[in-house]
Regions:
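Structural signal for interior beta-strand "rungs" in well-ordered beta-sheet cores
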Residues: 1-50, 54-57
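A glycine/serine/threonine-rich, flexible loop-to-helix segment
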Residues: 62
Length: 62
């Protein structure tokens, strides 16, 4: 039997075009995921991430 894990997307997240988000991943508040990224692990709040696999590019300071 196949079961999928949950994906949690918190408030204020921007997700670019054609992004793939794998199961059991949390994307933190106000994070930005660049177009065509593949998110394989959690992305912390207030970060910009992109690439294959997605990596943190920058931390957003407010």
């Amino acid at each position: 039997m196949y079961t999928a894990g949950s994906v949690i997307i918190e408030d204020g997240v921007w997700i670019g075009d054609k992004v793939t988000i794998l199961s059991n991943v949390r994307i933190g508040k106000n994070a930005i995921i660049g177009a065509n990224a593949v998110v394989t692990k959690d992305i912390p709040a207030n970060c910009v991430a992109g690439g294959v696999p997605a990596k943190i590019i920058k931390t957003i300071t407010q």
